[in-house]
């Protein structure tokens, strides 16, 4: 693609990784005149090093992907709209087959999806949409909260459900504060009271232990914006840049690093019961070994899963030398040099943290994966790092603007999962903001030693 579009500067070694990440951010957008354009969601995403990706080259990238049978969900929507625009008969067939269409979670609908729905609704088919503007959290996937707020069809009727049968009065009060600029004000029909939500000041591991001690045997759902925070708690890993470690493996040590990463990914998928995905990852790990087929993939996965208790606490050096070296044409040990120093300082669990699991039953999840769920007790972990920006990260409490700021809606989703007890963890709190939070009369603030 870079060669065909004469963007040779993108092929420099230091740029390859960044280009790969940036291309994942392109999406089809609906313009005000109804036309479709392929572009980055943010203009700065075009920048790679000191250069910019040409906008008119993006369609060429898509064509290459399509020629290889690679379709993104976004492409499916784009092509669906194109098909409907070229053949009105298809819309007639859809109307005849679906006289009634009910769409849940409509606040997460993209502009393209909304346009398709409006075309179908022009006659015959009756459309019903259900949603909550406060829970529109998929802007990165093309969703627009304004599209939901302003959605209109001829003869539309509006119904509101303001009763909250899930949470205590104390938690509902927090939700109403965070969502105060929306049109929805919730209440508890049975006025069920409970504990005042707590803000825990300190590290995530201390906060988790504190919350677990409070809830006892009752389940504690731990949520965070980024997947590495709940994963670090799940695996007992301290604060390190796990994503940087992952990229180091994939791009700095060629085949060996990739093999280690994809084998670990395979094992973690296997633990989750996603055997099909686990086998795909194992095949990726040994892709250059032409004798390594699905049978070998399954055999290796089974062996490594059986050894999990012996693997999970190893450094990457020990994991590689003990369980990968000597098997399936892996001939070279890690014995010396800078790579040995690196692999000896990184542990299996550090990399396991980066594997994007789809666990729906896990008590350690990202906020986005908790949509639609509920739990007795919830611990929300706010970005917990040395560069913690208190003003930015606490704005959803100190100066909420839920319609304008998607981050505030994401945190609203997390808070609204809680039924009985709610904890919010932040690493630090200034005296000034402590006073402002106390004025809200919504939280108890606890400093963890």
Positions of predicted regions on the chain:
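The feature marks helicase ATPase cores and/or their adjacent C-terminal helical subdomains
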Residues: 1-449
């Amino acid at each position: 693609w870079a060669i065909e579009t004469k963007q040779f500067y993108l092929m420099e070694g230091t740029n390859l990784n960044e280009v790969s990440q940036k291309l994942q951010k392109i999406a089809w957008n609906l313009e005000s005149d109804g036309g479709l354009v392929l572009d980055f969601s943010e203009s700065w995403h075009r920048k790679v090093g000191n250069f910019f990706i040409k906008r008119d080259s993006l369609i060429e990238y898509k064509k290459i992907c399509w020629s290889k049978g690679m379709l993104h969900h976004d492409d499916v929507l784009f092509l669906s709209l194109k098909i409907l625009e070229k053949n009105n008969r298809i819309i007639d067939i859809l109307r005849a087959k679906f006289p009634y269409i009910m769409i849940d979670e409509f606040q997460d609908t993209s502009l393209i999806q909304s346009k398709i729905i409006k075309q179908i609704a022009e006659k015959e088919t009756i459309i019903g949409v259900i949603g909550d503007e406060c829970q529109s959290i998929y802007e990165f996937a093309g969703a627009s909260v304004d599209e939901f707020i302003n959605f209109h069809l001829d003869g539309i009727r509006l119904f509101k459900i303001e009763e909250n049968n899930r949470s205590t009065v104390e938690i509902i009060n927090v939700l109403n504060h965070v969502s105060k600029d929306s049109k929805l004000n919730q209440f508890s029909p049975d006025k069920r009271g409970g504990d005042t939500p707590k803000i825990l000041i300190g590290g995530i591991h201390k906060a988790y232990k504190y919350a677990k001690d409070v809830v006892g045997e009752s389940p504690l759902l731990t949520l965070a914006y980024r997947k590495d925070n709940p994963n670090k708690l799940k695996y007992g890993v301290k604060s390190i840049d796990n994503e940087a470690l992952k990229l180091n493996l994939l791009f700095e040590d060629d085949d060996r690093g990739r093999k280690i990463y994809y084998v670990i990914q395979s094992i973690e998928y296997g633990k989750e019961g996603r055997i099909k995905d686990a086998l795909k990852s194992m095949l990726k790990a040994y892709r250059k070994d032409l004798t390594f087929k699905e049978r070998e993939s399954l055999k290796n996965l089974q062996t490594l899963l059986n050894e999990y208790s012996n693997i999970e606490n190893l450094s990457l050096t020990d994991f590689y030398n003990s369980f990968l070296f000597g098997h399936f044409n892996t001939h070279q040990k890690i014995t010396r040099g800078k790579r040995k120093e690196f692999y000896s300082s990184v542990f299996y669990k550090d990399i396991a943290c980066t594997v994007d699991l789809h666990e729906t039953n896990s008590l350690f999840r990202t906020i986005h994966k908790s949509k639609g769920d509920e739990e007795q007790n919830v611990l929300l972990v706010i970005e917990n790092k040395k560069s913690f920006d208190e003003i930015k990260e606490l704005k959803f409490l100190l100066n909420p603007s839920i319609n304008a700021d998607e981050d505030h809606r994401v945190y609203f989703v997390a808070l609204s999962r809680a039924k009985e007890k709610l904890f919010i963890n932040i690493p630090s709190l200034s005296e000034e903001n402590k006073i402002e939070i106390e004025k809200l009369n919504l939280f108890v603030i606890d400093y963890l030693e």
